[in-house]
Each structure stands twice: as structure tokens, then as C-alpha cells.
């Protein structure tokens, strides 16, 4: 069975959560919100969790995605944030 593509699994508009993992720094959560607001306007209440040693910070943010292109662009742009290791 071929692997399903993300666009085939989602029906737009839909709720979508991004999880951004990066080096623990004070501005990471603010940088994530700025990037998300550029492509998906709204008020956001991101959640963050520090790694056990405090080296990394993960920021989860929920959006209402209007189309697959918006999701794809956000994956790319969030990954460009300074110190980001991965975007899930």
C-alpha cells in the first residue's frame, strides 16, 4: 500500500498542530508566533516544554489550516528559525 500524502489525509480547513523543537532560548516561543502569524493570522496560545536537562525547548502551536500549501510553507519557514532542530 503506498504511503498516504498529508494532503490526502486532511480535509481543509482543519485544525493543525505544529511542534517546533529547538535550543532553549528566551525568544523561541515569540519567534514561532511571529512566523505563524505571517501565514495564518490569529491569536495563539503556544505551549512549551523544556527538555529534562533544559537544553531544548519544544513549542506546540495550533492553527486552523486553510490549505495544504499553507501547512507546507509553515514547515519550511518554522525550520528557518534560529536554533530550531526540527518541526513536527
UniProtKB/Swiss-Prot annotation:
Family annotation (SUPFAM superfamilies): YbeD/HP0495-like (SSF117991)
Cellular component, GO annotation: cytosol
Source superkingdom: Bacteria
Transmembrane segments: none
InterPro entries per the UniProt record, alphabetical: UPF0250_YbeD-like, YbeD-like_sf
PANTHER family, per the entry: UPF0250 PROTEIN YBED
NCBIfam families attached to this UniProt entry: PRK04998.1 (NF003447)
Family to which this protein belongs: Belongs to the UPF0250 family.
Protein name: UPF0250 protein PM1928
